[in-house]
C-alpha cells in the first residue's frame, strides 16, 4: 500500500494537469459556473460542515487498509455500512435510495463479472495447455538485458489488459513473471540506483498495478469504460467513450515509465516506514 502511494499521486497529478491544460486551451470543455449558480462563502461553510462525516468515513476506510486492520474487501464493507450511516445522519436513508443504489451496483457489477467469467475460462484453458511454460521459455530465450525483459513483460501485460480482466492476468502472468524478475539484477537507468534484493518484488508489484490500471481504461474490454457506459446517457456512443480514454492511456504510460526509471517513487515510503 505504501509503495503505491506516490505512484498514485503521480498519476492523479498527471490526470489533473491534463484536464487543466485541455480546459485552458478549450474553455468550452470545462466552462465556469454562471455567477447565479455559484455559492457564497456562507453556503460553502455550510456545505463543508455537511462533508465532515463523509471525510471521516474515507479516513476510516483508508486507515483500516493502511494499518493492516482489515483487507480492502473488508474495508469496503465497512465503507458501505458507514455510507448508510452517513445517509441516515443526513436523513436521506430511504428504501428508494437504497434500492436504486443496489440496482445500479448490480447492473454494473454483472456487466463486469460476465467479462471476468469469460476471461477466467480463457486463462484456465491457456494454462492447462502449457501456455505459461511456453511464455517463460520465450522470454528467457530472447537474450535481452534485464530492463529489456522488463519492457517485454510490460508490453505483454498491456496487450493482455486489452482483452482480459486484471484477475485473469494475475493468475496467468504473475506466476510466470515474478520468478523471472527476481532472478534478474537491475542496476538502474541513467545513473540512478535500481532496486535490489527483496525490493525488486515490491517494485515489480507496483509497476504491475500501474500497468493494470492502464488495462482498466483500455478498449475494447476496459472495465472502467463499461462502468462509464452504464452510468452515462444513451445518447453518448460507446465509440466516444473509447476515444476519450486514449489520452489517459498515454498518461498511464508516462506514469509507468517514470515508476520504472525512478524506483524511489515506489520504494521511498516503505523504506521510510520500515527501514532498509
Report residues per predicted region.
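Alpha-helical transmembrane segments of multi-pass membrane transport proteins
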Residues: 1-276
